[in-house]
Amino acid sequence: MDRDRADFQMAFDGLSTLGVKAVALQVPIREGEAFTGYVDVLTGKAYTFGADGAVSECDVPADVADDVSLLHDLTVENIAESDEELMEKYLEEGSLSLEDLQIGLRKGTVAGELCPVLVCSSLENKGGVAVLEAIQALLPAASERPAFVDALGQERKPDPDAPVAGFVFKTLADPFSG
């Protein structure tokens, strides 16, 4: 959110072209071009950032209230669709509890069916804590992951005593290349 003319809706909509079922967990709050906070789509609570990066609760701004409502409905439907039991409950009751949504979101994320979308500005130290909390809550620990075969054809299991294995990559767009 720290780039000039950053457009949340365009980025969110663009995820569908990647074949990903994106679920918006946050909607940015802006004052002009400045990223000043976010609305939690699941709870409907809004938060603003202080000068020191501290977060405080505030009212949902009128200019994003309709977007939050639409995204809330879409997010609930996508989470429900990712789990047969949740879908039945959603169809019977017409809604899901926050706890059901959080459990369904984690299951769908771990299964690779859902892609949570959050907002932050690392350059301005805004929203990073919420992103890290989402990573902790939604992604599986290494101990929950199955064994895999590495590039050398060896099976590797999660082991805290084994050497660190990682894959580092960077994407680059060169404006001068064809």
Label each PLM-derived region with a short phrase.
Residues 1-178:
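Structural and coupling elements of P-loop NTPases
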